[in-house]
């Protein structure tokens, strides 16, 4: 981050907070509670589909085993384009705002923002209603997944995956296991720490490290201590970079000894990079969900509905979840 890139105190946005070291184990037993907190077009042209998503968020085709996109194409004959277009929510919003704000279409038929950004897009009138009649497999969702508080009718969004934010680290660089958010401020790792530009993730962890409860924040003044600690770490050279989803390369290479990271990303990286670890800090971590929505004016809303229905089939959801290592919203697929 350059000096001109000041820490964004208005960006506490992506996650919900998960307190306590027992939360990681408990989370798999309380998935409905996690996911419930998260809560068109002309309908024609169902011969093609364009989905923009986050990196490391779908299973690819490997050898004779078809990935989700190729299975969908084979099952439906719909031509599908899938791209990894996100690095962080604010960056993606800045990308789509000029067109949607001018009443113009953007290219993708489906996007997968985190729930807070989806709520913002809905409030701005930039989303199409879903044709739920064409998504009968939505009945397979974990109870409470439809009708989140920001989409009370449940007509504009459906869940993609959920996960956790904690500390990712490269044990070959740290030389020890990490347990606390305070480890990010250890002088031994000066210049080798990564922080997420998603400030709710980063500041949430630091607040819990300071003994504060982020869920009770009423104003940014309540988080001032955490921002001050982060800004001091930046000015002291403790922080190497503020990143979005691209933290993974620096983590694997050892440019980062440790960073704020997302659970499924790290679990995937471990397949080829066993030196990479993930831990929910003893002070607490955060939990979140990303959702599928259809941007205003999308051409292929029927194909979008067909995709959503496909990924909510339990067999399809299981294969997807087994690869991405995030929490599936489909009942029985955890």
Outline where the language-model segments fall:
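N-terminal secretory signal peptides
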Residues: 1-12, 26-33
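C-terminal motif of bacterial Sec signal peptides marking the signal peptidase cleavage site
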Residues: 36-37
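Early extracytoplasmic/lumenal segment of secretory-pathway proteins
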Residues: 45-115
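A structural signal for short loop-to-beta-strand junctions that line the ligand-binding cleft
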Residues: 104-113, 128-167, 192
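Ligand-binding pocket segment of bilobal, Venus flytrap-like solute-binding proteins
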Residues: 119, 194-198, 202, 206, ...
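Short beta-strand->loop
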Residues: 128-138, 157, 185, 274-286, ...
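Mature extracytoplasmic/periplasmic domains
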Residues: 286, 290, 295-334
């Amino acid at each position: 981050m350059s000096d001109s890139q000041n820490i964004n105190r208005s960006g506490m946005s992506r996650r919900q907070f998960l307190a306590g070291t027992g939360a990681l184990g408990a989370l798999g037993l309380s998935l409905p509670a996690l996911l419930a907190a998260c809560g068109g077009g002309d309908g024609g042209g169902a011969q093609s589909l364009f989905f923009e998503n986050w990196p490391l968020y779908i299973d690819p085709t490997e050898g004779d085993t078809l990935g989700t996109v190729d299975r969908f194409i084979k099952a439906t004959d719909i031509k599908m384009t899938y791209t990894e277009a996100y690095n962080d929510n604010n960056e993606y919003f800045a990308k789509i705002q000029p067109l949607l704000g001018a009443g113009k279409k953007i290219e993708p038929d489906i996007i997968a923002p985190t729930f807070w950004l989806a709520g913002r897009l809905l409030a701005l009138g930039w989303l199409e209603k879903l044709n739920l009649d064409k998504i009968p497999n939505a009945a397979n969702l974990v109870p409470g997944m439809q009708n989140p508080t920001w989409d009370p009718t449940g007509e504009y969004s459906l869940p993609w995956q959920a996960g956790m934010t904690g500390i990712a680290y490269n044990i070959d660089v740290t030389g020890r296991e990490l347990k606390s958010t305070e480890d990010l401020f250890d002088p031994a790792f000066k210049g080798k720490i990564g922080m997420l530009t998603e400030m709710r993730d980063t500041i949430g962890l630091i607040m819990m490290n300071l003994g504060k409860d982020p869920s009770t924040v009423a104003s940014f003044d309540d988080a001032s201590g955490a921002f001050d600690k982060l800004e001091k770490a930046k000015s002291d050279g403790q922080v190497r970079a503020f990143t979005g989803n691209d933290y993974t390369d620096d983590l694997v290479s050892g440019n980062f000894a440790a960073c704020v990271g997302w659970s499924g990303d790290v679990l995937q990286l471990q397949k080829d990079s066993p030196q990479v670890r993930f831990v929910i800090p003893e002070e607490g971590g955060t939990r979140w969900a990303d959702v599928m929505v259809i941007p205003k004016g999308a051409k292929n809303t029927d194909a979008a509905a067909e995709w959503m229905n496909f990924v909510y089939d339990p067999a399809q959801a299981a294969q997807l979840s087994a690869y991405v290592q995030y929490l599936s919203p489909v009942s029985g697929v955890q």
